[in-house]
Amino acid sequence: MISDGDQLQEVLLWHQQRYPRMQIRDLVKLVYQNEFAGGHMIADAESSLQRLRAECQALAGNCSGEKPDEVFADIGNGLCRLQLAAIESTGIHLTTVNQFFVNTARSRRGDLTSLEQKLDVLRACCQAGSLPHAPADLDAFLLAYRAQGYPAISHSAVYRDHYNPAYRVVDSVYRDHFALFCRIDALLESQDTVCIAIDSPSGSGKSALSALLGQVYDCNL
């Protein structure tokens, strides 16, 4: 079985290869999200939804930056970045995406000790030459970052300008059942009520899937 450190290393290397203009700040942000997901509690789901709608509206009128060709980008620890620029053709409702995000933020905690251990994995990758960043530059960044109390941070200007990142960090279980959520939302376009039957052998996850649907939709189980 792959260790947590090895999994994180794979994630870091994949992202650096996929986004070669990643800076140290962007890698640290990736490690932070691997530990804390969105990094904050969502007290008001409606305000979160309004921000999501505004961001997607801005994306629709923005032709700059590289466009993602995948809906989800794995960030390890059972989490993904759901990339907003890639969802228009899927038919998924923004209310559904927002609920993915809210549920994930409310269920993930993380801790600073674990974050520091994961930053050590990042440091080891730089020391080994697996990532194109000088260990001394990383250490200087982390020294200042630690002094600030390890807050959630934004992407670097280089990353923002080239990749125009717009995403929500969500639990990977939503990726695993994304086709089902898209199908449900498509049905809700034409009818007020959707009945879903989950037919599978005992112990195959019917109860877990039912609970997941109940967390996303206002429904009876």
Can you annotate each of these PLM segments?
Residues 1-159:
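Long, basic/Gly/Ser/Thr-rich N-terminal segments
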Residues 99, 182-186, 215:
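Charged/polar, solvent-exposed surface patches and flexible loops
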Residues 162-189:
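N-terminal pre-Walker A segment at the start of P-loop NTPase domains
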Residues 191-196:
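Pre-Walker A (Motif I) flank of P-loop NTPase domains
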Residues 201:
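P-loop (Walker A) phosphate-binding loop of NTP-binding proteins
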Residues 206:
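Conserved lysine of the Walker
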Residues 209, 213:
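Hydrophobic positions on the alpha1 helix immediately C-terminal to the Walker A/P-loop
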Residues 214-221:
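Post-Walker A helix-loop "phosphate-sensing" segment adjacent to the P-loop in P-loop NTPases
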